[in-house]
Amino acid sequence: MRIIAIIPARGGSKRLQKKNIFPIWGRPMISWAISAAHQSELIDETWVTTEDPEIAAIAKEWGARIHNRDPKLAEDHIYKMEAIRSCYQHIEHHYSADVVISLQANSPQITAPVLDSAIQCFLKNNRNELISVDKNLMQNAAFRIMRPWYVYQRDLSTKTGVYVCDVVDVHTREDVKFIEESYNDRNS
């Protein structure tokens, strides 16, 4: 079984400039998602899709493969899944995957054990899609696990599941401050 993670990371963040590479716990924010995917026992390959050369260089430094995103797919009004689709279409030219994960660059609290547990839940329950939610069951966008054909799906499946993963979706300096004050380091 081949499982790939795709981390969408555009350079045009508005509320927190350079959000995806903003330092948190002494590292670029995106590095936490890349490390979690690399440390996963189930994820085979990690891709970052970006139009930003600085993000690409940092992601490559942390071991991710890079998909050079069309700048049109990095505009404010573009839905994240458009970038995921474009990246997966590129990957499909070389090989197919059994599971595709959209992994958020700005959820630095995500860990390999959480990802592995969510993937196992997805597979065990034979879902088409599994989305991360917070403790109030509200989507937090930390990850979205999908069957490869679901990357192209436009409608919600009746075989969608949720996985409780209480992480902060970082968009502001206040979010960064909250995480750093609430969790002295990533391992607390």
State what each model feature region is:
Residues R2-I3, I43, A97, R127:
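Local beta-strand N-terminus motif with an aromatic residue
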Residues T49-T50, V170:
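Short beta-strand scaffold positions
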Residues M29-E45:
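A short, N-terminal amphipathic alpha-helix
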Residues M1-Q17:
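N-terminal nucleotide-binding beta1-loop-alpha1 segment
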